[in-house]
């Protein structure tokens, strides 16, 4: 079933406009959220909030080289680097932090020459979903690094340290370096700052969890149903991202919408 679901989903993703829309909407969100914080700080005359809003942009620019390196790695290996568990394509099975490719020799029970041939065919057929994942990696890396820098600055200021002092610079460097494990994944184990940072990156790429959400949590319920009944996946190939897009719209609507 997942073999045919993968063919169907990749056919939907094969259009260049679909890929462009994914990147464009993610870039808009990455740029708008700091503006919201800066604007809110300006209205309240809160210089700290304004400073942290600009720090988000600073962090994204500072980490651009590393973001591109991680994005290339994701494209090369065909899997997410920073956050393998939450992604736009929500029908994939995750085992050991890696996505199981539906069209692969291992998944279909073939090895040797036959398995290699199926892997090659799968790489071609699943190229659209790989490109989608690569775009998500770029956006999520940018948001994560920007927010990590923002949270590092906030933590340093809360400790009463000057950002230009030796102690302040060491604290900034420590927090930023602790943001990733040895494989480049977000290091969220026993680290509240990094967990908060990853949540921000997920929200900015519309890949945050649907559980406990608005509209009586229907998005999460539909997602669970399709995970347990993949034969119906063709009815709604994507659940997480469209639901989060709608929730983001509801959160920004000037009048509270029913169910939010």
Which residue ranges define each predicted feature?
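Amphipathic interfacial helices
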Residues: 1-260
């Amino acid at each position: 079933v997942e073999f045919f679901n993968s063919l169907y989903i990749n056919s939907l993703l094969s259009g260049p406009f679909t890929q462009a829309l994914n990147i464009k909407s993610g870039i808009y969100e990455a740029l708008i959220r700091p503006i919201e914080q800066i604007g809110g700080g300006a209205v309240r005359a809160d210089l700290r909030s304004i400073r942290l809003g600009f720090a988000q942009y600073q962090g994204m620019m500072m980490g651009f080289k590393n973001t591109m390196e991680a994005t290339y790695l994701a494209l090369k290996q065909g899997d997410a680097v920073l956050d393998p568990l939450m992604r736009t394509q929500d029908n994939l099975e995750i085992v050991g932090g890696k996505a199981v490719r539906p069209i692969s020799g291992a998944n279909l029970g073939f090895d040797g020459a036959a398995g290699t041939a199926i892997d090659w065919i799968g790489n071609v057929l699943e190229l659209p979903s790989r490109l989608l994942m690569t775009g998500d990696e770029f956006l999520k890396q940018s948001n994560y690094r920007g927010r990590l820098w923002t949270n590092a600055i906030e933590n340093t200021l809360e400790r009463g340290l000057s950002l230009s002092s030796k102690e302040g610079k060491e604290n900034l460097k420590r927090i930023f370096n602790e943001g990733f494990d040895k494989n480049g994944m977000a290091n969220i184990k026993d680290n509240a700052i990094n967990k908060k940072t990853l949540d921000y990156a997920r929200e900015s790429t519309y890949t945050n969890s649907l559980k406990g959400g608005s509209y009586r949590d229907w998005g999460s319920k539909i997602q669970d149903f399709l995970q347990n009944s993949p034969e119906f996946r063709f009815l709604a190939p994507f659940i997480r991202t469209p639901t989060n897009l709608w929730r983001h719209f509801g959160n920004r609507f000037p009048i509270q919408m029913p169910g939010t």
